[in-house]
A protein has these predicted regions:
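ABC-family P-loop ATPase nucleotide-binding domain
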Residues: 1-12, 308-318
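ABC transporter nucleotide-binding domains
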Residues: 3-8, 13-211, 215-216
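Short loop or secondary-structure boundary microenvironments that flank
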Residues: 66, 73, 238, 271, ...
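A generic structural signal for secondary-structure junctions
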Residues: 81, 98, 107, 146, ...
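ABC transporter nucleotide-binding domain
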Residues: 176-268
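C-terminal coupling/interaction segments
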Residues: 269-318
């Protein structure tokens, strides 16, 4: 198993007696999209700034590809691309000129600069407006330009702070698709957001923050089972022959099978059994029309977690 690309061990940031980040621990694997999620003021941005060497660490440690961001900030900067909440481009310069300027600062060789910039702008869908001034860009276009800068840099990890903040739903969907494409090109990604449900589809794992601490961490499915209980819900729609309910019920890991209406079957399972359910439909002589896996929402998980925590506190106080 390869070493994690990011490690945080008992990472803490204090301002006087107040803890902005309070002893958090997490790893990010190579090729993973890892979400730092939670409400504003929970410690997500402070965590990002410590990972990048842009804020002092009070105690604990962080490593980015084995480098200490406090002692080796330039090594981290060479490997990591950063998209802050507010992207700082020059409004009176074109997208191309902005990237040429940052490419020079990064030390990218002149002979490859032009091709890298053109390729990066094409990948984020800005080729047609490459010569337009950035002052005419929408927030979504500015975010795309920020991703283009990360692509141009050939970063091995992208750290994105609230990338969908202020975007309409369609612009958010398009930006998240671009983030997925970074992963497809071998880039590891850390992103923060307070918009839990908007980004849950893109994250492999998430850490849910509250008051500077990580209160939950894992895949959405793992968190759902831990907090909400129950298992996976697999929905099957099929033109079936007799005996399909029996075949589905007999699958290992199936807890129950319901038929809310003819041709629809809802399975509660211990794990994702979509492949096995599809095979059962075929074996029963049926025709599979649709197969879906229902995932709990992060908003639901987060809300339930704190409802339960508050109830526990009330019981102990009574």
């Amino acid at each position: 198993m390869s070493a994690p690309v990011i490690e945080a061990k008992d990472l803490t940031k204090r301002y006087g007696t107040a803890s902005a980040v309070d002893g958090i621990n997490f790893n990010v694997a190579a090729g993973e999209i890892f979400g730092l999620l939670g409400p504003n003021g929970a410690g997500k941005t402070t965590t990002i700034l410590m990972l990048l060497g842009l804020s002092d660490i009070t105690s604990g440690e962080a490593r980015v590809f084995g480098h200490d961001p406090m002692r080796e900030p330039l090594a981290v900067k060479r490997l990591a691309g950063y998209l802050p909440d507010t992207v700082g481009f020059y409004d009176n310069m074109s997208a191309t000129d902005n990237l040429h300027y940052t490419a020079r600062l990064m030390g990218i060789a002149k002979r490859i600069r032009k091709d890298r910039i053109a390729s990066a702008l094409a990948r984020v869908g800005l080729a047609d407006v490459a010569e337009n001034k950035v002052g005419t860009f929408s927030r979504g276009m500015r975010q795309r330009l920020g991703l283009a800068e990360i692509i141009m840099k050939d970063a091995r990890i992208a750290i994105l702070d609230e990338p969908t903040n202020g975007l309409d739903p369609q612009a958010s969907i398009e930006l998240l698709e671009l983030i997925r494409s970074l992963k497809a090109h071998g880039v590891s990604i850390v992103l923060s957001s307070h918009l839990l449900d908007r980004v849950q589809s893109v994250c492999d794992r998430v850490a849910l923050f509250n008051a500077g601490r990580i209160v939950l961490m894992g895949t959405v499915g793992e968190l759902g089972r831990h907090v909400l209980g129950g298992g996976y819900a697999v929905e099957v729609e099929a033109e079936s022959s007799d005996g399909l309910v029996m075949r589905l019920s007999a699958l290992s890991g199936v807890r129950s099978v319901e038929t809310p209406e003819p041709g629809r079957f809802r399975m509660t399972c211990d794990r994702d059994l979509r492949a096995e359910a599809a095979a059962a439909v075929v074996a029963a002589g049926g025709r599979l029309k649709q197969l879906t896996l229902d995932q709990p929402s992060l908003e639901m998980i987060y809300t339930r977690y704190f409802q339960t925590a508050q109830q526990e506190e009330a019981r102990h106080a009574a």
